[in-house]
Amino acid sequence: MSSSISPLLTTAISVAILLFSTISTAATIPNIHRPFNKIYAFGDSFTDTGNSRSGEGPAGFGHLSSPPYGMTFFRRPTNRYSDGRLTIDFVAESMNLPFLPPYLSLKTTNANGTATDTHGVNFAVSGSTVIKHAFFVKNNLSLDMTPQSIETELAWFEKYLETLGTNQKVSLFKDSLFWIGEIGVNDYAYTLGSTVSSDTIRELSISTFTRFLETLLNKGVKYMLVQGHPATGCLTLAMSLAAEDDRDSLGCVQSANNQSYTHNLALQSKLKQLRIKYPSATIVYADYWNAYRAVIKHPSKYGITEKFKACCGIGEPYNFQVFQTCGTDAATVCKDPNQYINWDGVHLTEAMYKVMADMFLDGTFTRPRFSDLLIKKLNYL
């Protein structure tokens, strides 16, 4: 499996080990010089490659096991909330690794009772939250929501670790990239219209998420990328539900974007503290908010012609209705998903996920640059 990676990414690898030459912008990392042998992913529906099925994901988006999901690349539904690949898929491809198997479909053990050799596992779950499910139950907010949280994903990871032999565990932390996809947007979404304030959600979410990251770091994780929240005010769902006078300079929902921006500031502050506390680890922040807005500002630069409408859905003005979402009988699909940012009202098209992957991998919207993480890793080889 091959895919293009950015010239900057290729250059970083070349400098680090002095074994690469720039062949073209479509270069791939040779198997013998993979910077990472494994990737472990966490997150929500923006990263989930199959831990959810139809009827199990976010309320109103329960048709991911049916066409037209998966139409662009896989030609069939693969339980990804998109027409094709996600950002994590492009990350795996860029490192010449297979797509990550979802944890719930993984055959974890062999005849000896130890874990089968894989190139990583995806623990992300669609609709998941950062805050424990019990919090939402206590506040009568658990109707039609996914019960899994980041702590569920951590528990799955720890259960997976139990199947590993000693050498496998050592190799896992030495040779693995931990990709923490966007998670926490659902915490805000599930409390909309309730008496629970966004400040409360932010404080609980950031503190819980920080504990999650520290648990991984205490286990020995050395290479970690953490995505911030995207510009949620630019999503079709937000555009269709918010008041028309609630708009920012880009035409997105200002209140929603401000909420994501404030959350990301708090997250970045915590990451700075973690870098000081764990100096031997490399923790990269992926600025999803600004990366997304960069595409909104200059869509034609990325081959995009439709910034706000959903490719798959029904109804004006955004081709989206909450009760007739993608996969229902009434929904239709646009002719070319590659020209759209949004796939089904909330989730993105393969084309947009690829743009995000490229921006993160080439370091345009990562701090420190993703290439710095690669150089540090390859200097240990």
Curated annotation (Swiss-Prot):
Domain of life: Eukaryota
Keyword Iron: no
GO molecular function: acetylesterase activity
Disulphide linkage map: none
InterPro entries assigned to the protein according to its UniProt record, in alphabetical order: GDSL, SGNH_hydro_sf, SGNH_plant_lipase-like
Magnesium in keyword set: no
Alphabetic keyword roster: Glycoprotein, Hydrolase, Lipid degradation, Lipid metabolism, Secreted, Signal
Matching SUPFAM superfamilies: SGNH hydrolase
Signal peptide, first to last residue: 1-26
Top-level EC class: hydrolase
Residue stretches spanning the membrane: none
Pfam family, one: Lipase_GDSL
A biological-process GO annotation: fatty acid metabolic process
Family membership: Belongs to the 'GDSL' lipolytic enzyme family.
Positions bearing carbohydrate: N112, N140, N258
Organism in which the protein naturally occurs: Arabidopsis thaliana
Compartments reported by the entry: Secreted
GO CC, alphabetical: extracellular region
Name assigned to this protein: GDSL esterase/lipase At3g48460
Major subcellular site: secreted
Active site, UniProt feature: S45, D344, H347
UniProt EC number: 3.1.1.-
